[in-house]
Amino acid sequence: MKYKVLILTHGKLAGSLYDTVKFIYGSTDGLAYLNMPEPFDQSTYGKMIADIVSENKEQGTLILCDLFGGSPFLTSARLLKENGDHMELVTGVNLGMLLELMANIESAGIKELKDIALSSGKDGIIDMKERLGKQ
């Protein structure tokens, strides 16, 4: 299966985000996830990620991680050095970001998907008191 977007997080958050996208959006075509294996083994985890990136070299892969500096991010950042031409990496994955990506996953390339992830991630953080005060 070809994937454009790969969710990587600590624990089982990646799978929960995936399941929630499927519940809300219906389709998860082009979306994949890897839960962090227990016990954690950097080498095994890195190989699992590398295999998905390698299988999708033609279209590329956008990797979404939960935290900058965490194990999913650090493992992916190492791969980015080797696969920069067909891989993008963004941290701060959230449900709103994933839903926006799913709406564009078939038509957009990974660089455009990266831009969508960045803007929707930032735009989805709202201070409601501030917003109400401006209206």
Where are these regions (language model features)?
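N-terminal loops that bind phosphate or other acidic moieties
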Residues: 2-91, 95-135
